Amino acid sequence: MPRSQKNDNFIDKTFTVVADIILKVLPTTVREKAAFSYYRDGMSAQAEGEYAEALQNYYEAMRLEIDPYDRSYILYNIGLIHTSNGEHGKALEYYYQAIERNPSLPQALNNIAVIYHYRGEQAIEEGNIATSEILFNQAASYWKQAIRLAPNSYIEAQNWLKITGRIEDNINL
């Protein structure tokens, strides 16, 4: 039984019902409907922390989905799972693929920045200040891109950029 048919969560059930109605109303192919079903089941599994199941669904959705924009969200969610699992290198690969297909995906840019910032912090702990500066500058670059796309988001990143002297104000993003 598909995950979408066994949800006990009210919000997930509501989303599933609305998504099913939209799929019936909009002119979509069987392939597109199947891709969306796998994507939806992947999101549901991911929300419950069932990452292996979520990845299986996302990979199947990727196999079926041909639209680059839709694929960007699948890739982004795969990146989220790898981030949650501490697999930052893999996560970066998926985030890069997501923004390659959809350059207007600020959350992927933000997550790339977060990983570079984390690696910068690790470099400091290891006593490698030069490497930390390179990593922090990479984080700053990605945060600036994310903030340009979503100026009212990523307030902590904006503050970090100001505090560290990487921007003087929002105009210089």
Curated annotation (Swiss-Prot):
Bilayer topology term: Peripheral membrane protein
Keywords: Chloroplast, Membrane, Photosynthesis, Plastid, Repeat, Thylakoid, TPR repeat
Record GO biological process: photosynthesis
Superkingdom per UniProt: Eukaryota
UniProt-annotated location(s): Plastid, Chloroplast thylakoid membrane
Residues in coiled coil: none
Pfam family, one: TPR_1
Annotated TPR repeat ranges: 35-68, 72-105, 120-153
Predominant localisation class: plastid
InterPro entries (alphabetical): PSI_Ycf3_assembly, TPR-like_helical_dom_sf, TPR_rpt
Entry's Gene Ontology cellular component terms: chloroplast thylakoid membrane
SUPFAM superfamilies per UniProt: TPR-like (SSF48452)
Family: Belongs to the Ycf3 family.
Function: Essential for the assembly of the photosystem I (PSI) complex. May act as a chaperone-like factor to guide the assembly of the PSI subunits.
Protein name: Photosystem I assembly protein Ycf3
